[in-house]
Amino acid sequence: MANNRSPITEQRRIAHIADALAHEQGEYTRLGEEVGIVGAESSLEREGMVILPDIDGPNEGNHSGDIYAVAYDEDSRPRSLHVVAAKGYSHRLRTRPVDGAYATQGSPEYARHLMLTDRCLHAALAKDPVLRRGILDGSIEVIADVYRTPRPYMSSVIHPSAIPVPLDRAYASTLQSIVRQHPDYTE
């Protein structure tokens, strides 16, 4: 059967299909991010962690983390801060330039970068002197985590990595000076 469409009509049809595909790919990405966040939050809460409120999450700018969660000991004292990269479906971990090299989400380098640049985290640390002091003096461990939710079922959450994030004195001093400038800072 011969195609009776003109080349112009065929080009328009292909352009329309391409636009629709681009829209659907964007929607797939957005839904994957939502599935990743919901899966990671659900898993973190099942593990007994408390998610820091008012964190912007994915796609809120290049300097914001997906999730920050705090694990507490049996006496309700903060034990660790988790800097979480949450991935849904088959989304890959992203990289970004950090100090002249590329750092991958879920790595200690990436976590340290986020901690210096994420204003929402700065606000949370400014309001919580116990958490802030513990991070700065090293008594509260910082951990870079990756949580993957490959399917939209909470039972499918995978936690492939949890890596300690070392913070030296110079880094702690820099973070302290950034957080201290926040209007909600309390001693």
At which residue positions do the language-model features occur?
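Short acidic loop-to-beta-strand element that houses the catalytic metal-binding Asp/Glu
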Residues: 64-70
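Catalytic cores of nucleic-acid endonucleases
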Residues: 23, 27-28, 38, 50-60, ...
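Acidic-basic catalytic patches of nuclease active cores, encompassing PD-(D/E)XK
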Residues: 2-59
